[in-house]
Design a protein with these regions (language model features):
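Class I S-adenosyl-L-methionine
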Residues: 1-153
Length: 153
């Protein structure tokens, strides 16, 4: 799961609410500027941020396939919120060719199911802004037939 440092606690809460166990920061995207010749620095809340973490969380006892997968990813910025494609390749190298899905995706990727309001998938309905509520910590009240159920993936 991609996260940002100012929202890290929310990411960890969501992992727990979905029934996963947080293990580590799997990847650290070191953002290069679009030309790839320097580094991007955001405005930051405390310090001028550059990196974005991708967290690893598990259910069950999955086995690591490769011990040679590095954590650092040096890659240029893309369009807003689009993540480096090479992280998908690193995930497959790390865990093997298992069924996988990218939630909140912006594009299709070979070998991956994708879901998100900008992904080339069936229409995604708007949802309450509080992801933890969606995950079952609190059930929002909605009138019957107001919203189609979420697609089963």
């Amino acid at each position: 799961m991609w996260a940002t440092y100012p929202k890290m606690q929310e990411a960890l809460d969501l992992i727990e609410a979905w029934g996963f166990k947080y293990k580590s920061i799997a990847f650290q995207w070191i953002k290069q500027n679009r030309s790839g010749n320097g580094y991007f620095f955001g405005l930051g809340r405390w310090t001028r941020g550059n990196t974005e973490p991708c967290l690893i969380a598990i259910k069950g006892k999955p086995k690591r396939i490769s011990a040679g997968v590095g954590q650092l990813v040096f890659s240029p910025l893309r369009r807003h919120s689009q993540k480096p494609a090479e992280v998908r390749e690193k995930i497959v190298e790390l865990m093997g060719d298992l069924p996988r899905i990218e939630l909140f995706a912006r594009e299709a990727a070979p070998g991956w199911d994708v879901w998100g309001n900008e992904a080339p998938t069936p229409e995604v309905k708007d949802a309450p802004a509080d992801s933890v509520e969606l995950a079952g910590k609190e059930e929002p009240h909605e009138p019957d037939n107001q919203r189609d159920p979420a697609p089963q993936l």
